[in-house]
Amino acid sequence: MNSIHSEYKQRNLKIWNEVAPRYHKRWTSVNKGPFQSTKKLIELVKINKNYHVLDVACGTGAVTKYIQKKLGKSGYVLGIDTSTIAIKIAKKWNEKNKNLDFVNIDAENFAFSKKFDVVTCQYALFFFPNAQKALKNMKNSLKKSGLIGISVHGSKDNVPFFSSILDSATKYIPDYVPPGTPNLDRFGTKSALKTEVRKAGFSNIIIKEFIFNYNPGKFEDYWNNYIKYIAKPLKEKFNALEYSKRSEFKNAVKEKTLQYTKKMVI
């Protein structure tokens, strides 16, 4: 791993450890916005009650918990993630549930002697600097007849909830996205995702596209939630802007959201 990717991973881990509690509170217990994909993902991999499942980059356990509900007494699901805080939350959230475990593991550096029937990975592949390494680890963890289910965001232009702020943020805060950060948009098309997965040795690949609508409320709700939930390093960069620039930034975001907020969908 080159040094710039190593720095990115360390920085990203620190951020996830900070935001995990807020992220969990806001998203993982609801079936709204992007998390409508959880149900779709599990439906597509067709979990059998006796399956052993690996959930890669499980975060605070949203997908893992959903999988566990599909399993019988002989089934088992293991959630893995690099964030110690996310894993701690996942364990607490699932402390009464049986036949599941959570372990601190880097998706780019793991191997299991035992093979799984299904591997899932929701909204994480694009965060891995070496996505190929992570995918090959997942493939090596599968039984020969096993299935992998992956969810990724579409291209940011098709995800206005993110692009409305990100496009303006990178204009007003030039280092908003630090050096070494992988292109989070790189698997946002069917062809790009299929090419990457095939390169890792997978076959019989099926890509499905879904649209999940989300109503963030009025613009002030959308904006205030952005300020409330962003990580400390980004908030510090925002607060370092002159007041006039912060106002310009906010107005630029508002302008971008008009076409969506009028429809109450973003």
Which role fits each region the language model picked out?
Residues Q132-L147:
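A short glycine-rich, Lys/Arg-flanked "PGG" loop and its adjoining helix->strand segment in the class I
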Residues E108-V119:
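A short acidic, Gly/Pro-enriched loop at the edge of an enzyme's catalytic core
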Residues D117-A131, G154:
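A short SAM/SAH-binding and catalytic strip from SAM-dependent methyltransferases
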Residues N2-Y51, A62-Y66, A86-I89, W93, G149-D175, ...:
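Conserved class I S-adenosyl-L-methionine
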Residues N2-Y8, R22, R26, N31-F35, ...:
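Conserved Class I S-adenosyl-L-methionine
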Residues N12, V30, P34-T38, S83-A86, ...:
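Conserved donor sugar-nucleotide recognition element shared by glycan-biosynthetic enzymes
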